[in-house]
């Protein structure tokens, strides 16, 4: 129940608000009322949100046991690897469909990394947590350093699953 209250509920609220914004403003490039960052960053934020939502839903359906997924906490690595590489259970791991889904996981990982890093810095500016331009720049530096490190960690984990 802890994961529902601390993970799923906040993500569901964030996704719901994001979908409402997306329905209202679409994926158009260059929204004039946006004051924190470039139009490209805002557009990439929306695109990464759509990709990330599909990725998270797919991930939940393939991993979570209570949704029929294959993940087993007692055998975390092998069951996660099996869930990624054997999306279609009766197909071999090297089948093009399974390879495609493994690549989509990598695309989802990139989208999540960008969305979180950009969202943290932009959100802090919008909420007034970075009160000066210097504080905003420092936070951007931290996010720009953390994002590649997180992406590298994710890619290394993905490669570990890929060579299993």
At which residue positions do the language-model features occur?
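Membrane-embedded alpha-helical bundles that constitute the cytochrome b-like, heme-associated redox core
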Residues: 1-164
